């Protein structure tokens, strides 16, 4: 094991002379640094033609009475701009392997319309297609991540899509793009060759998909200086054999990344309520969510064994909580509320993701608007930002920052699952001379007194900003008419001492500190 892995993954807290004493938890941040950068893409988003994610969420059309920017909802557009979204995946999800891109180009009133059989049988009029997605990404400075159709599409269809988007040559596809109003090609880096090939993307074996991937990848060309980063449809959860087969059978042969999907679901038959849950269910969900650390380790171990040079990246391009839909909504639309519990889940996941960015290069939460663990919820002309949105915003200081390893000595809360829940968690980074420290208190009732110590005695001399996200109850959420029930506010329960930074974390809270 190399030195970096020893720092990142050590199970023993080497806290020197600092003990718990008057503190409930003690943290030591190794401020000398790791030399590892946290990719901004860890904070990626996912948008699918599912429920009201696209229509009514991102897109209302230019003729809508909802305020819009070229057809994009202005309130959602502005919220995403403030969030500094680095990358967004589209058009799915399961929808991707039913999506035929030529249905979504040309005059909107002449586009094909279909029934979205994957998600509730909703009419799909294709008014949001390639141009609308890529133009949105361009306007918001988001890197697009296209998911191609392997399940029901042909090699030719996928190859022509890449040419349509990225070629500046004199060709039928490039001329078709120009005829549809886009003269210059777009830059498209990330391209997924299929989605969930083991399930809704074709119910394939890993051996069969590996061969199919290599065939499709062969014909996805690099045009006009654009270089595709090709991504294989990877495993779900604990299917380590899928990763092993793809790494052996594809390896570096046209594969730059391999995906992984992991949802925080305990029982797929009854996923539980988003807002009405017991204390026991709260801790069980947190436990299930942080099991992702062991899942990441095991997939990465396989990749390290078969790709010791680290040429293939791991991309967690679907993750987040998944509950029963809100009562009275279409079961196929996956609309759920979003509480302070989800904010804690998001923070704990980021704390884990940061440890594994030697191999983990992207994560895309499901989904950006109105679906699953959404950033934003809309209802006709109204919009609310969820607690999860606020965690993404509070944590975006870690994008492209140097990861600082930290040891945490904390009590844990036992639950019905195999992984106990740490009462305190931490992640830290440094960028532009600033040290950014994010702290989590998972305990529902107890404020946690925490000492944050540093290897260097003069690592921190001043706290420049401090905010906290919390509420009176983990079940609290933002809703239409009470949009700011859970929102960040200034935080003052800290002080600098000779021993370090002493912080008192409120129950069920996320705290962000920036210091120098």
Regions found by a protein language model. Name each.
Residues 21-244, 248-257, 289-293, 297-325, ...:
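Non-catalytic accessory regions flanking glycosidase/transglycosidase catalytic cores in CAZymes
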């Amino acid at each position: 094991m190399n030195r970096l892995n020893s720092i990142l993954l050590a199970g023993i807290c080497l806290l020197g002379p600092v003990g718990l004493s008057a503190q409930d938890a003690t943290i030591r941040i190794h401020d000398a640094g790791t030399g590892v950068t946290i990719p901004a893409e860890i904070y990626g988003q996912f948008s699918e033609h599912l429920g009201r994610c696209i229509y009514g969420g991102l897109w209302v059309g230019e003729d809508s009475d909802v305020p819009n920017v070229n057809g994009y909802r202005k309130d959602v557009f502005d919220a995403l701009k403030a969030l500094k979204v680095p990358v967004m995946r589209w058009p799915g999800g399961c929808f991707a392997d039913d999506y035929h891109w030529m249905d979504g180009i040309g005059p909107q009133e002449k586009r094909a319309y279909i029934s979205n059989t994957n998600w509730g049988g909703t009419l799909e009029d294709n008014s949001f297609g390639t141009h609308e997605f890529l133009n949105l990404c361009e306007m918001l400075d988001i890197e697009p991540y296209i998911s191609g159709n392997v399940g029901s599409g042909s090699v030719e269809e996928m190859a022509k899509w890449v040419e349509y988007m990225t070629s500046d040559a004199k060709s039928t596809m490039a001329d078709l793009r120009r005829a549809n109003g886009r003269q210059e090609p777009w830059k498209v880096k990330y391209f997924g060759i299929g989605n969930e090939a083991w399930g809704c993307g074709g119910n394939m074996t890993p051996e069969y998909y590996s061969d199919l991937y290599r065939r499709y990848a062969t014909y996805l060309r690099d045009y006009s200086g654009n270089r595709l980063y090709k991504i294989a449809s990877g495993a779900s959860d604990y299917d380590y054999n899928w990763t092993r087969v793809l790494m052996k059978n594809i390896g570096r042969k046209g594969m730059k990344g391999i995906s992984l999907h992991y949802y925080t679901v305990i029982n797929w038959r009854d996923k539980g309520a988003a807002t009405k849950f017991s204390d026991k269910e709260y801790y069980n969900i947190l436990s299930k969510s942080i099991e992702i650390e062991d899942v990441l380790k095991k997939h990465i171990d396989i990749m390290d064994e078969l790709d010791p040079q680290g040429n293939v990246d791991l991309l967690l391009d679907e993750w987040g909580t998944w509950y029963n839909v809100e009562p009275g909504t279409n079961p196929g639309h996956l609309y759920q509320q979003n509480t302070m519990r989800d904010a804690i889940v998001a923070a704990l996941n980021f704390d884990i993701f940061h440890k594994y960015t030697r191999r983990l290069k992207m994560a895309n939460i499901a989904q950006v608007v109105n679906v699953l663990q959404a950033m934003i919820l809309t209802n006709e002309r109204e919009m609310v930002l969820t607690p999860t949105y606020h965690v993404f915003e509070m944590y975006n200081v870690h994008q492209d920052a140097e990861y600082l390893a930290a040891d945490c000595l904390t009590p844990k809360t036992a639950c019905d699952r195999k992984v106990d829940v740490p009462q305190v968690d931490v992640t830290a980074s440094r960028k532009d001379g600033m040290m950014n420290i994010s702290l989590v208190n998972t305990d529902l009732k107890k404020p946690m007194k925490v000492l944050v110590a540093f290897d260097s005695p003069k690592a921190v001399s001043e706290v420049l900003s401090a905010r906290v996200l919390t509420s009176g109850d983990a079940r609290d959420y933002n809703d239409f008419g009470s949009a700011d029930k859970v929102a960040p506010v200034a935080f003052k329960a800290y002080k600098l001492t000779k021993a370090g930074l002493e912080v008192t974390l409120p129950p069920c809270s996320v705290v962000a500190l920036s210091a120098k």
